[in-house]
């Protein structure tokens, strides 16, 4: 039981699961997703640009939650003006992550409440990605 609690806390569950209707992914799931290069999936790193510039999951976009908590409530033109990239299509799956899962979960809720019906979370986020060597993979 304690191991399951620690795995949940650290985001290192060995399989994906759906909690409270929010799909969440493990490191192995994320590795497969990144390797597929699916144009219908958008990886959303919600850390600040200074964190993102150090290390991030390949092909992810940076939408910083702390400095832009309501970014997904913005219209597309204002989103692009403030964030510097086009606003993701609401028909795509958005997978949110941050450093440890907290900001990613918060940003996922904001996006869900503003018309994004296919949102997911990588709860282990960058801590899990780096601890499993994801930053060293050639994807």
UniProtKB/Swiss-Prot annotation:
It holds the Pfam family Rhodanese. SUPFAM superfamilies: Rhodanese/Cell cycle control phosphatase (SSF52821). One of its GO terms (biological process) is sulfur compound metabolic process. Its EC number is 2.8.1.-. CDD domains: RHOD_HSP67B2 (cd01519). The modification Phosphoserine is found at residue 26. GO terms for cellular component: endoplasmic reticulum; mitochondrial outer membrane; mitochondrion. It is found in: Mitochondrion. InterPro entries: Rhodanese-like_dom (IPR001763), Rhodanese-like_dom_sf (IPR036873). The active site is at residue 98. It catalyses: thiosulfate + glutathione = S-sulfanylglutathione + sulfite + H(+). Changing residue 98 to A/S: Leads to the loss of catalytic activity. GSS(-) is a potent inhibitor of RDL1, since the presence of the sulfur dioxygenase strongly increases the RDL1 catalytic activity. SMART domains: RHOD. GO terms for molecular function: thiosulfate-cyanide sulfurtransferase activity. Keywords: Mitochondrion, Phosphoprotein, Transferase. Residues 37-138 form the Rhodanese domain. It comes from the Eukaryota. Its main location: mitochondrion. Thiosulfate:glutathione sulfurtransferase (TST) required to produce S-sulfanylglutathione (GSS(-)), a central intermediate in hydrogen sulfide metabolism. Provides the link between the first step in H(2)S metabolism performed by the sulfide:quinone oxidoreductase (SQOR) which catalyzes the conversion of H(2)S to thiosulfate, and the sulfur dioxygenase (SDO) which uses GSS(-) as substrate. The thermodynamic coupling of the irreversible SDO and reversible TST reactions provides a model for the physiologically relevant reaction with thiosulfate as the sulfane donor. Present with 7470 molecules/cell in log phase SD medium. PANTHER family: THIOSULFATE SULFURTRANSFERASE RDL2, MITOCHONDRIAL-RELATED, THIOSULFATE SULFURTRANSFERASE_RHODANESE-LIKE DOMAIN-CONTAINING PROTEIN 3. This is Thiosulfate:glutathione sulfurtransferase.
